[in-house]
Structure formats: C-alpha cells, structure tokens
Amino acid sequence: MAPAPAVLTRLLCAGVRRWPGFLQKAIPGPAEQNGRKVTGAPVPAVSEPQDGDDFQSRILDTPLQHSDFFNVKELFSVKSLFEARVHLGHKAGCRHRFMEPYIFGNRLGQDIIDLDQTALNLQLALNFTAHVAYRKGIILFVSRNRQFSHLIETTAQACGEYAHTRYFKGGLLTNAQLLFGPSVRLPDLIIFLHTLNNVFEPHVAVRDAAKMNIPTVGIVDTNCNPCLITYPIPGNDDSPQAIQLFCKLFRTTINRAKEKRRQMEALHRLQSPKGSEGSGTSPVPDKSHSP
C-alpha cells in the first residue's frame, strides 16, 4: 500500500531544514554540512599545513619520494632474525593454510619460516610505521600475551605511543563515539605483537580494525591468519628473543621518524623568509601527542 501524501512529504524532507517565509531552498542539516558525514573513521595523520604549499611539499611530500627515506633496512639483517629464532614456527598440525606461502620447509615436524620473505615484509612494515610516526599519527601496540605485557608497554612508552595489553572488549573501535564521546580519535596504526588471544582465537581488534579501515601491522606465526592484517610479518611470536627484537625495531623506527620530523621542521623554519627575519624568536614547540 502506497504511503499517504503527508507521510511521503515528511520522508522526503528528512534531514533538511527550511526557513519559513523565505525561499524554499533546502539547507543541509548538521550531518551534511561541508559535504561530509559524521563517521567513526580515523582522522588522517596529516597535520595542518604551515606556510601553505611550501610546508606541504618540503616536509610532508619529501619522504614519499624515496623508497627507504628512514633507512629502516639497515636496522636488521637475515642473520639477526635467525639469531632471534624468528624462523621457528609451530608444529605442522597447527599450520594455517594461508601461511603456507611463507613456510620454507619442515624439520622434525616443526615448520620453518622463510626469513627472506620475513625480511622483505618487515622492511615494508617498518617503513609504513615510520611514515605514520613522521606525520604525527597515533600508534597503538596491542597484545594479549601476559608474558610480554610489560615489555610492550615499556616499548610504547619509550617511543611516546600507546599500548593495550589487557582484555580487549569488542566494539571499542567500532562504537568509540558512543563509548568515549564524539571527540575521540581512533589510532592511525595498530601494531599487533600477537594476532591471537589467550585461547588461540583471532584477536577481536584485528576484525574491528578491518571494519574501521585502520591499517595494521602484525606478527603472524604459522598458526595465524594473515588475511586481515595490512602488513603481515611472518615470524615467531612465542620466543622472548623474537619479541624483544621486534619491539626494539619498532621503537627505533618510531623514534627515528619523529626525530627526522623535528629536523625537517627546524630546517624549514631556518630556510623560510619568516625564520630568517626573526631568528631570535623561540622555536615552535612540538605539539605531538604524549601518552
């Protein structure tokens, strides 16, 4: 049955305000101002431009023109990965079928991870992490393993980022505006040191991050599913030596990217006309987030 004319008029005018006595021109409601809708997607990690396009081209676009602007390739080698036991996987019976392309072979019933692929994926993950930290993005370390909780929290604190090593309630990312308010900002990158929880099930945050289009970096063992991880790093996630190596690499990469950002901003202030005229002025303080 077709709706009544009055009901149809209300449906067509939903979300639109009209001023009585003036021209019947629709004015967009609060949810449609500026052509954008209020969503729970994370805010881009690009800071507001300073001095127009010059700041954009010199500071923000320069790292994108180099394949390894932060020299993350020199932080590790295949030998260092081997010495940290990154190549050791689980038993062949626990193997996930999507991890088969990253497995080098099997020895005495234990899967061996191909370290050449691990080094390639690790370089891509560290490079992406450095670019996010360079643009002052929020990085969240996530793990559910109690054995490495203190190490992960210390790593996040050392590089000025955040960590979540306790129980992760489902909906913290998808319903963040309802739980924390409309002004909450979601992380720009989530680093999973373990993609499984205590009962060897996929971590809830992996699924929620995929729903919210939040990029993820994750250490995936031979019993993990790498499909929902944006930058999977095949490697051992149970050995203390391996986790210490990964934490050291992430901490060094983030600190290096932040230091590079401070150097680029200082160089830009010195080269700009305003900086040369007022050399006696105090430098602009770093407004990056602090945990």
From Swiss-Prot:
Entry-linked InterPro entries: Ribosomal_uS2, Ribosomal_uS2_bac/mit/plastid, Ribosomal_uS2_CS, Ribosomal_uS2_flav_dom_sf
Protein's name according to its UniProt entry: Small ribosomal subunit protein uS2m
GO cellular component terms listed in the entry, alphabetical order: mitochondrial inner membrane; mitochondrial small ribosomal subunit; mitochondrion
Function field: Required for mitoribosome formation and stability, and mitochondrial translation.
PANTHER family according to UniProt: 30S RIBOSOMAL PROTEIN S2 PROKARYOTIC AND ORGANELLAR, SMALL RIBOSOMAL SUBUNIT PROTEIN US2M
Oligomeric form and interacting partners: Component of the mitochondrial ribosome small subunit (28S) which comprises a 12S rRNA and about 30 distinct proteins.
Compartments, as annotated in UniProt: Mitochondrion
Gene: Mrps2
Pfam entry (one): Ribosomal_S2
